[in-house]
Amino acid sequence: MDTRTPEVPCGDLLQNAAENLLLEVEEHFQALTTTLNLRMEEMGSRIEDLQRNVDDLMTQAGIENSIKEPAT
């Protein structure tokens, strides 16, 4: 008795197509992750700049900063 699984017509082609699709999705996901990380870093820098500008304006206006930032 033959215990091998029956050959599926075009099975190898389908498997290759699925593997290629998964690799392509993985590449796109990695590119998106990289882009999002860069944009988050840029946003963090902009927020820090904004906080410094607000602090400077408050100092110029003679207003004490009542909200203290945690030390980093």
Swiss-Prot record:
Keyword tags: Coiled coil
Gene3D superfamilies, per database record: 1.20.5.430
Source species, domain of life: Eukaryota
GO molecular function, one term: transcription corepressor activity
Keyword Lipoprotein: no
UniProt key word Endoplasmic reticulum: no
Pfam families reported for this sequence: HSBP1
Coiled coil region boundaries: 12-62
Similarity field: Belongs to the HSBP1 family.
Stated name of the protein: Heat shock factor-binding protein 1-like protein 1
Native organism: Mus musculus
